[in-house]
Amino acid sequence: MMMVMMAAGCWFSLPVHSQRISVGKKGLVKVMRTDSTCAQEFVRDEHQSVATRKMAKAAGAAEGVNTLANYLKSDVDLNIPVSKVKQEKTFAVIIANENYQEEVNVEFALNDGMAFREYCIKLLGIPESNLHIRKDATLNNMLAEINWMQNIAKAYGAEARFIFYYAGHGMPDESNGTSYLLPVDGKSNILATGYSMSRLYAELNGLNAACVTVLMDACFSGSKRGEGMLASARGVALKAKAEAPKGNMLVMTAAQGSETAYPYKEKKHGLFTYFLLKKLQESKGKVTYGDLFDYVKTNVAQKSVVVNEKSQTPTIAVSGDLVSTWQGIRLNED
């Protein structure tokens, strides 16, 4: 007897001594006592195919579900200290822009945002309801988050504390060096599609909060994270004009002037974010802004020269109201 089967789009025949052929669950064909190892191979292949389909189905079911395991892959993503402190009046917005529509992507920005979220919840004691994370945020998404912060400020007044974290592209105005954040739907040669730092600072200052912390894993020279320039930027890095924060605001940025904010590929994070998290992890959050910045600046500068063969120097800008006190302030206030 000859049995005809189809596999991988091709028909073939197998000699079979027995007519005991059955179709089991999942359409698996069982062939009993054949003269050829082809039949055994066919059954084995079908087993593998069924297993593959099961895996694909499971992956499809999980699509769109953002779990920590999907993003976090380095030592700072494991063993995150858990604090007993609960900061009920601290609110955080995290923007993680990795996948751009018109520009090159920002490697590991989603890892950065997801990891910082975990530190906010576990180590800083910020309730999940007090934290918004936007992955691949458009300009409207970013404006919506600022509006949310403004509404919080109206309800809580001067008792509220805010953290604004951003990982993604920055861009300069080539005519005057003014800095912009670049949403994923923006283009670096169309300023109207960006979100200016001067506007951001003005709106954050308008919160009239007890303290506003801004953390930027971005550069504003027109360079992309890694090598090269933004697709629509000039072929030279520009020196971005430093914006001055006002009110009770502290701004820590990944790089200065015409420098680039680099990735730390081994750790699957931005270099700046990795060492920011590393210090928080090692200190269990018991670290002042002064010590935190010194650690981040030193380690980023040293590691960048080694792994990227380029300079990267984190900077800090402090509003006039915090000049004399910022070094003693902590993210984890207890």
Task: Identify the role of each PLM range.
Residues 1-20:
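Bacterial Sec-dependent N-terminal signal peptides
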Residues 18-334:
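Cysteine endopeptidase catalytic domains of the caspase/legumain-like
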